[in-house]
């Protein structure tokens, strides 16, 4: 889980915007005492099939949506490309973003579901995108934003922690900071995940690396669109 600290233009800097991720199995008590401090509740997560059908969480999340509204917090649907084993599937991403009919199906199904359940926003959290799918993914986000905004739904997209445009690696090459910053209403900078189970020993979010990610993001994306992720 992570917190999202949102940057806004100068005139809003006295106003703190704090969002947070939560699973449907979160403790009722923990959620209720946390919601008064949150601007947005990012419910993790919804999946999809290669044909564009939405896959809902195994556990009911309507109670979370209801609790969010009772605390003036916006509920956000987090969309992830998980396979049957619960891990990110880049092949599923490829199948979706290169198929216009699947995209049309998914967006239509999401809009129907989100209006029915009361979601106020969509968070697109796709990771390990093939570099060959970079532009197609950006176009997918742009189309989601265009369609969702017609219904008053805000769209954000999660960005892997890049520090340059030519950064190598499966986690980075499929994400176009500038393109996605223009395509979505806002972006979540994943400034963390530097140190993890299979990496060299280091902090999860070293301050110097966090600073580099933010500085690169600011060179590509308007400040008002940037949300800073904290692990």
Protein language model features and the residues they cover:
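Extracellular/periplasmic catalytic domains that process cell-envelope and extracellular macromolecules
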Residues: 11-14, 32-37, 69-71, 115-116, ...
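Pocket-edge positions in alpha/beta enzyme catalytic cores
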Residues: 95-98, 129, 172, 202
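Extended, hydrophobic interaction surfaces within ordered domains
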Residues: 1-5
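Glycan-recognition patch characteristic of GH18 chitinases/ENGases
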Residues: 6-109
């Amino acid at each position: 889980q992570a917190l999202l600290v949102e940057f806004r233009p100068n005139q809003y800097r006295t106003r703190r915007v704090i969002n947070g991720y939560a699973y449907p199995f979160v403790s009722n008590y923990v959620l209720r005492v946390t919601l008064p401090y949150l601007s947005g509740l990012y419910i993790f997560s919804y999946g999809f099939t290669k044909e564009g059908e939405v896959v809902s969480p195994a556990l009911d999340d309507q109670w979370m949506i209801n609790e969010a509204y009772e605390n003036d917090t916006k509920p956000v649907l987090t969309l992830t490309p998980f396979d049957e084993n619960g891990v990110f599937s880049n092949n599923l991403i490829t199948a979706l973003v290169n198929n216009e009919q699947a995209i049309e199906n998914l967006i239509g199904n999401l809009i129907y579901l989100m209006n029915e359940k009361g979601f106020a926003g969509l968070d697109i959290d796709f990771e390990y995108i093939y570099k060959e799918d970079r532009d197609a993914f950006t176009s997918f986000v742009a189309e989601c934003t265009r369609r969702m905004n017609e219904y008053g739904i805000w769209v954000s997209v999660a960005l892997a922690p890049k520090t340059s445009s030519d950064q190598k690696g499966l986690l980075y090459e499929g994400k176009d900071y500038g393109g996605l910053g223009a395509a979505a209403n806002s972006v979540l900078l994943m400034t963390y995940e530097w140190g993890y189970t299979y990496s060299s020993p280091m902090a999860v979010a070293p301050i110097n690396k966090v600073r580099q990610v933010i500085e690169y993001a600011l060179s590509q994306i308007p400040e008002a669109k940037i949300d800073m992720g904290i692990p």
